[in-house]
Swiss-Prot record:
<comment type="function">
    <text>May play a role in triacylglycerol packaging into adipocytes. May function as a coat protein involved in the biogenesis of lipid droplets.</text>
</comment>
<feature type="repeat" description="10">
    <location>
        <begin position="401"/>
        <end position="433"/>
    </location>
</feature>
<keyword id="KW-1003">Cell membrane</keyword>
<feature type="repeat" description="7">
    <location>
        <begin position="302"/>
        <end position="334"/>
    </location>
</feature>
<comment type="similarity">
    <text>Belongs to the perilipin family.</text>
</comment>
<feature type="repeat" description="27">
    <location>
        <begin position="962"/>
        <end position="994"/>
    </location>
</feature>
<dbReference type="InterPro" id="IPR004279">
    <property type="entry name" value="Perilipin"/>
</dbReference>
<feature type="repeat" description="18">
    <location>
        <begin position="665"/>
        <end position="697"/>
    </location>
</feature>
<feature type="region of interest" description="Disordered">
    <location>
        <begin position="1"/>
        <end position="21"/>
    </location>
</feature>
<keyword id="KW-0597">Phosphoprotein</keyword>
<keyword id="KW-0472">Membrane</keyword>
<feature type="repeat" description="13">
    <location>
        <begin position="500"/>
        <end position="532"/>
    </location>
</feature>
<feature type="repeat" description="24">
    <location>
        <begin position="863"/>
        <end position="895"/>
    </location>
</feature>
<dbReference type="GO" id="GO:0005886">
    <property type="term" value="C:plasma membrane"/>
</dbReference>
<feature type="repeat" description="20">
    <location>
        <begin position="731"/>
        <end position="763"/>
    </location>
</feature>
<feature type="modified residue" description="Phosphoserine">
    <location>
        <position position="25"/>
    </location>
</feature>
<feature type="repeat" description="22">
    <location>
        <begin position="797"/>
        <end position="829"/>
    </location>
</feature>
Length: 1403
């Protein structure tokens, strides 16, 4: 930065010839120099601010204007400016607008006297026409010391007409009390009105706590459906084990065999636990069922209590047997267990589940979740194996398994879950979900099992069972929670939805309460069923904890959609209060074929403060939707001096004719002190012939280690061979926090869709990192390739984390999606948690591979890797997402973001690389991600995210939103990079992608962060040390009638360092892209954040928009001002700089450029610098000085308005519209002979105009380098030979200001030259050789700019700059040679233009 910590610079020694010598041979330099000399006094930086609003935030030049940013280590283009007066004393960063969606956000926070672990699991969505089944599980943990924790989840779903969806919601809360009172109630109500043919059963198994005793409990679930059954669903969960000097083993074996013609079977079981010392525990289950007319249902509910034994033995089992013989169509079973453990406190947990099924629903939903584990000097192993085989004619199979957590003190814990499903002939749907519970033993042995047997003999259609196991761990106050699952089966429903969430709370000297309210209404003709399950765990030591979950679902008529939402919220508070809420609303209206899923994990760590986090997700799908969504999350584990291993293996094979298969598995998290933790998820899916949908989701939790090692990997493989329509896989790996260790996390997602695939969606996010005296690297690589005919895919995920020490944090996320008519989209969201490790090593990897060969329609994969907290260690995280869709694919959307980093005396690096390639016929691709994080020490932080999406008529778009977390760094360096590449080859209409990463750190201050992304503009963030930080993001999307476009926007939030910030962003775009960067204040050191986006557009693209980077740099002088320089270049011809800034005139102002203007908004170089000294603007109208232009060869004139009107009504060939549809291009060979010559001259006039701009900018660069040379010589005591420079030096009064002025000028001129290059590229469509050379010229300029901007904290290096500038000159000379050849021999493939579109629909 121009203002270093000590405010001094060390002048370098001259290393030979000056830079100016490299410009001497440049042709046209002297002429261009003479040109600009006439307009020297008329240009000023205030002209550059025409695109800046009064607040100092650059307003977008057009609807799609972008603040692209060039890559570099320093926060380059932000110069001292004359923005608002309030910004002058403190560096602030203006932010550009982006109107588009954004993808993926994740956050984690770790504070003093606290620890947070949060795991977020899986997201799945199946697309058009699918008859999917979805299962999801989520697990979360919260720890609070001497505080209050509140967590609420509100999920609303509205399905209006023709919905065929199914939603189920279940939640289980656990409480642990010592010397207190515990009450747990379960209320399950089911109403079946007309013609329903369902059966509901509910069972719960209690918990057992033994001191020096033995406990055994088993869960065995067997389902046999013989003839004519349609659906079978099973869900099991195994809990966690806490052993002190003991051994714990828990196993769950679920076997399902469906022989002939069975369609769907669903079973879910849960077992709970209770631990009470010197207290009272009460558990009640109230199950009411009302069956009115013609119902053929059967309801069974059972629950077993809790047992507390001291030096004894306890055995508890749950046996549920159901036999339905003839004509039964549906059977539903639900079981929940509640565990309570309280130390000198009171805990209350209630579950209210209401279900109303009216007419014709046919679906079944199951949800399961798992608990957590705590181990001290022990070993924990967790494994999950899920195998699915569907042979012939099967339509849907869903399986989800999760493994719980284990808490061991000098012991060993092992938990395994084996789920096997075999569907032989004609089966349509099978869903299974298993989770493992938890056990707390002191010097003893515990075994817990659940046995659920269901036999449906003839003609049964549906069977649903739900069971969950809870967990309890208490050392004077521990709670680990369970899962509650609700199921509604109506009539004629075809879809299945499952949602699970777990919320854990750990409170010391507080109060804990947990309640769940689930309401479901299905009115007429709905064919869907929705299930939602959440587990809430509470750990209270002499305190109270409250957690609430509200889930409302409404399915009206004929809808065919499925919605699933899962969230995990972890809160760790020391002497504070934490609140977290989640609101999920979904509406499906008319004809829409979309599916929306949203999952978020929010982790909060507060020491002596308050935390509040809210999530609001709204989705509206109108009519005829046919989609399915699933979301799962995993929890966390805490281990001291032990080793933990957790693995999840999910294998799915669908052979012939299968339509849907969904699997969801999540593994818990581990916290180890001086131990080793390993976690892996392996998900393989193979769909051979005719399969339509396959969904798999797995996620691994988080690991917390002290002086240990943690490894986590996720491997997801999907192969779809022939005729498959949909495949969805989601995997997430947890987070890791290491002190004095190393953490590595990688995510690799590969997708290959060959022929006829319609949709592929992948989203990966990496969490956040907290490092003290270490190094953190985070990388995200997302590649998308859509070749032919792809239409739309959407994926959205957001995670938020907050780290506060003695402060307050509030975070909210609001995601709204509205799809009105005919939409065919799918949305999925998943996030992962975080981990805390001290003096250990953590490695986490996620590998997701998908191959779809022929005829596949939809494939969705989502993987996320968690966060890492390292003290004096190293953390590396990478996400690699590759997508390849070859022919016939309709839509592919991928969004990934890397999280945040918290480092004390360390270095953090984060990169995001998003590559999108759309080749032929692709219609829409949308990705949206935002990263916002807040880390506050002794302050307050608030963060909100509002994402609104509206798709009205006939839209075929997809929206994805994801956000990743933030970083906290003290006295070190943080680097974050975002690289977005987009390639659109042929016939693509619109593709927009944007990503941003950001972080906020406040020391002894208050931070408020809100994300506000609108189609027009965004507002920036302010960072203050001992101050306030605000960030807002608003994302709105409106798609009207028949629109086939996709919009993507990204915003990077701000970072405030305790002693330094350095931010740089570099973006190169040939595709419509938007990036928004927020940046903050610096104390002494630097944070580097870079965003690099490189899209490329090829021939035949309908609308490609090229944005050049906005660059910003903050200076810490008294008058230093962080400003924003924005350059935007669009594929359609833009009005000249002279028009934009009044520096001249062009012969013909072009109306088609009114809204797509290539512009630059820049503030003054410094408050003390005069306007004249700021330099000239490179863009000068080529007709402004005709006398000077005579020596430059033939000057071509553009077509007049009359000529263009004649061309518009002619019978010319196909026309390629610009992005704003205000102008168009035509292939030169397709023009009539009468128009060909003038069109050729018209195109050349634009090329010449851009050439003159580039030459002028190069000439000024030469002069600027000369001034730089003299400035450095003056610093070494030499005389300044230029009087004007002496004057400037006297005015500024310091060498630092001189160097800053020279550097600012170099950056500005590089920007102007880059803009000229970009405009040239837009005029060279259809000329790949020339475009390649132009790209090389821009690349060489970007390297030069990187050198200039990266030297912000030291002197410019003459030798390096000389070499780079020589490369710039050489590349430009090569480009001019090709342009000369183009003038002599124009190829017929050249897309000439732009020509103004005529009104009245003539085009």
């Amino acid at each position: 930065m121009s203002a270093s910590g000590d405010g001094t610079r060390v002048p370098p020694k001259s290393k030979g010839k000056t830079l100016s010598s490299f410009f001497g041979s440049l042709p046209g330099f002297s002429s261009a120099r003479n040109l600009v000399s006439h307009t020297h006094s008329s240009t000023s930086t205030k002209d550059l601010q025409t695109a800046t609003d009064p607040s100092g935030t650059p307003a977008p030049s057009s609807k799609v204007s972008t603040n692209s940013q060039m890559a570099g280590d320093a926060a380059g283009l932000l110069q001292p400016s004359e923005q608002t007066a309030g910004d002058k004393d403190m560096g602030s960063f203006s932010v550009t607008s982006s109107e588009d969606a954004f993808s993926g956000v994740f956050g984690i926070m770790d504070a003093a006297k606290g620890m947070v672990q949060g795991g977020l699991g899986a997201t799945q969505s199946a697309l058009v026409g699918t008859k999917e089944a979805v299962s999801g599980g989520v697990m979360g943990a919260v720890g609070v010391a001497k505080g209050l924790v509140k967590g609420g989840l509100d999920t609303s779903k509205n399905v209006l007409t023709n919905t065929k969806d199914t939603v189920t919601t279940g939640v289980m809360g656990a409480a642990n009390m010592a010397k207190g009172t515990v009450q747990t109630g379960l209320d399950t109500t089911k109403s079946v009105v007309m013609g329903t043919k369902d059966t509901v059963a509910t069972g719960l198994a209690g918990a057992v706590n033994v001191a020096k005793g033995t406990i055994q409990g088993g869960l065995d679930t067997t389902k046999s459906v013989v003839m004519g059954t349609k659906d079978t669903v099973t869900t099991g969960l195994t809990g966690a084990v806490n052993v002190a000097k003991g051994v714990v083993q828990g196993g769950l074996d679920t076997t399902k065999s469906v022989v002939m013609g069975t369609k769907d079977t669903v079973t879910t079981g849960l077992t709970g636990a209770m631990n009470v010392a010197k207290g009272t525990a009460q558990m009640g289950i109230d199950t009411s069922k009302t069956v009115l007319t013609g119902t053929k249902d059967t309801v069974c509910a059972g629950a077993t209590g809790a047992i507390n034994v001291a030096k004894g033995a306890a055995q508890g089992g749950l046996d549920t047997t159901k036999s339905v013989l003839i004509g039964t169509k549906d059977t539903v079973t639900t079981g929940l267990t509640g565990a309570v453990n309280v130390a000198k406190g009171a805990v209350q947990g209630g579950l209210d589940t209401t279900k109303s099924v009216v007419m014709g629903t046919k679906d079944t939903v199951t949800t399961g979740l798992t608990g957590a584990m705590n181990v001290a000097k022990g070993t924990a192993q967790m494994g999950l194996g899920t195998s699915k085989t569907v042979l012939t004619g099967t339509k849907d199979t869903v399986c989800a398994g999760l493994t719980g957590a284990i808490n061991v003190a000098k012991g060993a814990a092992q938990g395994g879950l084996d789920t096997t499903k075999s569907v032989l002939m004609g089966t349509k749907d099978t869903v299974t979900t298993g989770l493992t519970g938890a056990v707390n033993v002191a010097k003893g042995t515990i075994q817990g099992g659940l046995d659920t047997t269901k036999s449906v003999v003839m003609g049964t259609k549906d069977t649903v069972t739900t069971g969950l196991t809870g967990a309890v761990n208490v050392a004077k106050g521990t709670i680990q929670g369970g899962l509650d699952t609700t199921k509604s089966v109506v009539m004629g429903t075809k879809d299945t939805v499952t949602t699970g969430l777990t919320g854990a709370v750990n409170v010391a000297k507080g109060a804990a309460q947990g309640g769940l309210d689930t309401t479901k209404s299905v009115v007429m003709g709905t064919k869907d069923t929705v299930t939602t399950g959440l587990t809430g765990a509470m750990n209270v030591a002499k305190g109270t904890a409250q957690m609430g979950l509200g889930t409302s679902k409404t399915v009206l008529t004929g809808t065919k959609d499925t919605v699933c939402a899962g969230l995990t919220g972890a809160i760790n508070v020391a002497k504070g209060a934490a609140q977290g809420g989640l609101d999920t609303t979904k509406s499906v209206l008319m004809g829409t074929k979309d599916t929306v899923t949203t999952g978020l994990t929010g982790a909060v760590n507060v020491a002596k403060g308050t935390i509040q986090g809210g999530l609001d997700t709204t989705k509206s799908v109108v009519m005829g939707t046919k989609d399915t969504v699933t979301t799962g999350l995993t929890g966390a584990v805490n281990v001291a001096k032990g080793a933990v291993q957790g693995g999840l293996d999910t294998t799915k094979s669908v052979v012939m004719g299968t339509k849907d298969t969904v699997t969801t598995g999540l593994t818990g998290a581990l916290n180890v002190a001086k131990g080793t933790a390993q976690m892996g998820i392996d998900t393989s899916k193979t769909v051979l012939i005719g399969t339509k949908d396959t969904v798999c989701a797995g996620a691994t939790g988080a690991i917390n280690m002290a002086k240990g090692a943690a490894q986590g990997g996720l491997d997801t493989t999907k192969s779809v061979l022939m005729g498959t329509k949909d495949t969805v896989t989601t995997g997430l790996t947890g987070a890791i926090n290491v002190a004095k260790g190393s953490a590595q996390g990688g995510l690799d997602t590969t997708k290959s869709v060959l022929i006829g695939t319609k949709d592929t969606v992948t989203t990966g996010l990496t969490g956040a990192l907290n490092v003290a005296k270490g190094t953190v690297q985070t990388g995200l690589d997302t590649s998308q390739r859509v070749l032919t005919g792809t239409k739309d895919n959407v994926y959205a995920g957001v995670t938020g984390a907050v780290n506060v020490a003695k402060g307050t944090i509030q975070g909210g996320l609001d995601t709204t999606k509205s799809v009105v008519m005919g939409t065919k989209d799918t949305v999925t969201t998943g996030l992962t948690g975080a981990v805390n490790v001290a003096k250990g090593a953590v490695q986490g990897g996620l590998d997701t591979t998908k191959s779809v060969v022929m005829g596949t329609k939809d494939t969705v994969t989502t993987g996320l890797t968690g966060a890492m907290n390292v003290a004096k260690g190293t953390a590396q995280m990478g996400i690699d997402t590759s997508k390849t869709v070859l022919t016939g694919t309709k839509d592919t959307v991928c969004a990934g973001l890397t999280g945040a980093i918290n480092v004390a005396k360390g270095a953090t690096q984060g990169g995001l690389d998003t590559t999108k390639s759309v080749l032929m016929g692709t219609k829409d691709t949308v990705t949206t991600g935002l990263t916002g994080a807040i880390n506050v020490a002794k302050g307050a932080a608030q963060g909100g995210l509002d994402t609104t999406k509206s798709v009205l008529l006939g839209t075929k778009d997809t929206v994805t939103t994801g956000l990743t977390g933030a970083a906290n760094v003290a006295k070190e360096t943080v680097q974050m990079g975002l690289d977005t590449s987009k390639n659109i080859l042929m016939d693509t209409k619109d593709s927009i992608c944007a990503g941003a990463t950001g972080a906020i750190t406040v020391v002894k201050g208050a931070a408020q962060g809100g994300l506000d992304t609108s189609n027009a503009a965004l507002t920036g963030t302010m960072d203050t040390a001992k101050g306030t930080v605000q960030t807002s993001l608003d994302t709105s999307k409106h798609m009207l009638i028949g629109m086939k476009d996709t919009v993507c926007a990204g915003v990077t939030s701000a970072m405030n360092m305790a002693k330094g910030i350095h931010k740089n962003t570099d973006t190169t775009r040939d595709t419509q892209s938007s990036v928004l960067a927020h940046s903050g204040n610096v104390a002494t050191n630097a944070i580097h954040t870079g965003v690099h986006t490189v899209p490329s557009s090829l021939s035949g693209s309908h609308s490609i928009i090229c944005h050049e980077p906005s660059i910003y740099r903050a200076t810490n002088h008294g008058v230093g001002q962080a400003i924003l320089t924005s350059t935007e270049s669009l594929c359609c011809e833009t009005s000249s700089f002279s028009d934009k800034y009044g520096l001249g005139h062009v012969t013909e102002p072009r109306a088609d450029t009114k809204t797509l203007v290539s512009g630059m908004a820049s503030s003054a170089c410094a408050a003390t610098r005069s306007v004249e000294e700021c330099g000239q603007l490179a863009a000068t109208g080529f007709a402004a000085l005709p006398d000077e232009l005579k020596g430059l060869g033939d000057i071509f004139q553009p077509m007049t308005t009359e000529e263009q009107a004649q061309l518009a009504v002619s019978e010319s060939g196909p026309r390629v519209l610009s992005a704003d549809r205000g102008s168009y291009y035509i292939r030169l060979g397709d023009l009539a002979p009468s128009f060909r010559q003038r069109a050729f001259e018209h195109a050349l006039s634009h090329i010449q105009h851009n050439q003159f701009q580039a030459r002028a900018a190069l000439a000024q660069l030469q002069e600027a380098f000369q001034m730089t040379d003299m400035t450095m010589e003056a610093a070494c005591g030499k005389l300044c030979s230029d009087q004007s420079l002496n004057t400037m030096v006297e005015a500024v009064g310091s060498h630092e200001m001189r160097a800053s002025v020279a550097q600012d000028r170099l950056c500005t001129l590089a920007h102007q030259l880059h803009a000229a290059y970009s405009s040239l590229v837009t005029s060279l469509q259809g000329l790949p050789e020339v475009q390649q050379q132009a790209g090389q010229a821009r690349h060489s300029l970007c390297k030069l700019y990187g050198l200039v901007s990266s030297e912000a904290g030291s002197e410019l290096q003459t030798e390096q700059l000389a070499q780079s500038s020589a490369g710039v000159v050489e590349a430009w000379q090569g480009l001019e040679v090709l342009l000369e050849k183009l003038q002599q021999n124009p190829p017929l493939s050249w897309l000439v233009g732009p020509f103004t579109s005529m009104p009245c629909g003539q085009l």
